């Protein structure tokens, strides 16, 4: 099966550690953990997550956790046809700010799979607002 990759970058007005921690907080608007009515989140290596959003459930397992620079987890939903895909998020110091880069690989090249780009951009347009600034879109 052919797969695609989604990459979204944002510059956020806060240091990497603060951005990293906020991204893993289910109370922070603009994170994938802050959707729907049911969230189970265990953000550590081999920790699992389950999200029941408005339309479809998502689940996965954290495979890397290197605070404050990088995290990686699997991502499974009906939109990935039940197959594991991989989400890697990096947080790099960029002057006084943080360059946050999200790369989602292994997404099926289907209409539902291609919808992940819109979804991640939605989150990463809201998330920077928690730090007192709107998004500054790079890609």
Give residue ranges: language-model regions.
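Short acidic N-proximal helix/loop "leader" segments that mark the beginning
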Residues: 1-5
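Short beta-edge strand/loop motif at the mouth of beta-sheet-based domains
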Residues: 7-8, 14, 25-57, 70, ...
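Conserved catalytic core of Hanks-type protein kinase domains
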Residues: 22-23, 65
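Solvent-exposed alpha-helix faces
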Residues: 24-25, 125
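Hydrophobic-ligand binding "helix-grip"
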Residues: 39-40, 44, 52-96, 105
């Amino acid at each position: 099966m052919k797969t695609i990759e989604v990459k979204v970058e944002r510059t956020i007005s806060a240091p990497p550690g603060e951005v990293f921690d906020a991204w893993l907080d289910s109370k922070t608007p603009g994170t994938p953990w802050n959707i729907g009515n049911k969230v189970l989140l265990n953000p550590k290596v081999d920790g699992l997550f389950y999200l029941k959003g408005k339309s479809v459930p998502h689940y996965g397992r954290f495979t890397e956790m290197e605070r404050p620079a990088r995290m990686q987890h699997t991502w499974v939903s009906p939109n990935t046809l039940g197959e594991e895909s991989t989400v890697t998020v990096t947080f790099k110091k960029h002057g006084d700010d943080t360059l946050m880069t999200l790369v989602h690989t292994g997404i099926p090249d289907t209409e539902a799979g291609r919808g992940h780009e819109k979804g991640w951009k939605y989150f990463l347009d809201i998330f920077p607002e928690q730090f007192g600034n709107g998004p500054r879109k790079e890609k």
